[in-house]
Amino acid sequence: ELIDALLLRHISIIGVDCAGVRRGAEHPPMDQHCADHDVFIVENLCHLGDVLQGRPFARCHVHTYPMNFTGMTGLPCRVAVD
């Protein structure tokens, strides 16, 4: 599975351009599985094509600025790339 392969690489963040890495009932357990490995999922990213600039992959620095709310399992955050 791709997610477990990424976790083995000791990444910090998984960014996706959709509502999650799993659908329905599988969504919360997978988010927790990643969080248990100190990896957080940033969902609903847009303009990823601008980062790739036509390339199949790109190296970049991604900065996340989560908003601090209590009592939530997911937090809105701002994302900036340089």
Residue ranges and their predicted role:
Residues 1-82:
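Active-/binding-site microenvironments in catalytic and ligand-binding cores
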